[in-house]
Amino acid sequence: MTTRTTQSGIIETLAGNGEPGYAGDGGPAGAASLNEPKGLCVDREGNLYIADSENHVVRRVDRVTGIITTVAGVCPSGATGPAVPEPPVAAQAEEDEDPFADHSGDSTKAYTQVTDLSGTVRYVTGGRLTVEHDSGDGGPARRARLNFPSAVAVDRAGNLYIADTMNHRVRKVDAATGIITNVAGTGQARYYGDDGPAVSAAINEPTGLAVSDEALYIADQSNNRVRRVDLATGVITTVAGDGTAAYSGDQVSAVQASLAGPSGVALGGDGVVYVADTFNSRIRSVDPATGQIATVAGDGGTYRYQGPAEPSSPSLSRPAGIAVGSDGNVYMTDSDSHLIRVWNGRSKTISRLSGTGVAQFGGDGGDALAGSLSYPFGVAVDASGTVYVADTFNHRIRVLTATA
């Protein structure tokens, strides 16, 4: 695999003013506040959905008007937003405990995020708002409670799927009614339930989603697997990963291969399932005909982009978000290198689209290659090839548009 740079495009901010918080609903998206946005998706009309993770909501930017609104979740207490009656919220005192212990038996723990120098995000308990894990199912999505949502996907009918990450569930907002329901996960941070109803199966920190007419795919990150929910039957199965956090198994059955914290999943037009195998620093693919897995990008090497003067490298550094364009190219957030890159399936080359390798904000209105990002997590691409980026630690959504 070789590397190159792409034809220059323009980078701009679409949503977020850079100040972490929750504000601006009903106004221009660029003037609104976001708080560590993670996943993104674009519907058939070009409207953008944002998993506004630290705000525990999903927001929508209207393609025509540029107005931002909240479509799922309850805004944080004290935040500036639309007046929506909320159920009582419980507070929890901070405790001394192992921040990485298994709390799956306690569904009312409060979580916050800590990040190490590499940008790895962890969830720890104590001291924040308690989020009721099952609050809102069967009612309006705007009154439901989410817990660090990390990914969103929209199907052909306009139904919205949400990776409700720290509730260990995937939820669905009906396009016609706005009602939210659970479609996968019991709320327990465990692994069980394959070949049975997805709502009776356990998933563990889902962080990526992709949906087709037939199935919903879930990056079941802490189970080191990719799961599939048949939309006709509701049955869940594993399509990749043996549960071991390791790298192994290319050119074998995907369910016999090892993944390490997969954070993203995407579908090609030919049915190929692409996986951001984050802690293996690779992009993997699963062939729909054979079920075999292969590595398509990344070599597992330790890599941090140092600038255009350095020798080109095919290595990735904890890729998180992934999307497939109508041209079959695979777009990815090379998160720890603060880059957006693209893999060309025809030429087998990997290219830099945006990012300088430095975690900062800059470059709006100019060459996308000179634009700075900070730990980008999510990426989406629309039918015209416009690329949307969750510039997570800059608390913005950036957009990359091609030049003539």
Model-based region annotation:
Residues 42-45, 154-157, 211-214, 267-270, ...:
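Residue-level detector of Asp-centered blade-edge/turn motifs that repeat once per structural unit
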Residues 3-36, 66-91, 103-148, 178-205, ...:
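Gly/Pro-rich loop segments of beta-rich domains
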Residues 47-49, 159-161, 216-218, 272-274, ...:
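Conserved beta-propeller blade signature
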Residues 375-404:
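Blade-level signature of beta-propeller repeat domains, shared across WD40, Kelch, NHL, RCC1
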